[in-house]
Design a protein with these regions (language model features):
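Amphipathic alpha-helical segments typified by the pilin-like N-terminal helix
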Residues: 1-22
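Periplasmic/extracellular, small/polar-rich flexible segments of pilin-like filament-forming proteins
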Residues: 23-109
């Protein structure tokens, strides 16, 4: 459970950081650009392409993986957090969870 809370915390600050970064002109391309770092017990990857950015979080223990998505749809920023255990394809659609993954809300603290 602690692993899930850590992943959700990282997703939360990533989304907040990307919302602010986009306000100033563009999405950040790394956690370092956002002033963030991750725990050594998780593998993280930031993907930024055009109007979307994603943070993939894969804890080294367990099979649950996470992704935070921030997407500009032309009029507003859309955000989504997802978790799942199945591998995902490289074909991602805007602000949609990977196939077989579940969207979830991260409570604000």
């Amino acid at each position: 459970m602690n692993q899930r809370l850590q992943a959700e915390s990282l997703l939360r600050v990533f989304v907040r950081g990307q919302l602010a970064s986009f306000y100033w002109g563009q999405f950040a391309s790394s956690l370092v650009d956002l002033g963030l770092s991750s725990d050594k017990n998780v593998n993280v990857r930031v993907e930024t392409k055009g109007s979307s950015t994603r943070l993939w979080v894969s804890p080294q223990r367990g099979s649950e993986n996470y992704v935070a998505i921030v997407h500009f749809n032309g009029s507003k920023l859309v955000r989504r957090q997802c978790r799942g255990i199945t591998p995902v394809s490289a074909d991602h659609k805007a602000a949609v969870c990977p196939e077989g993954w579940k969207a979830f809300e991260i409570p604000e603290v």
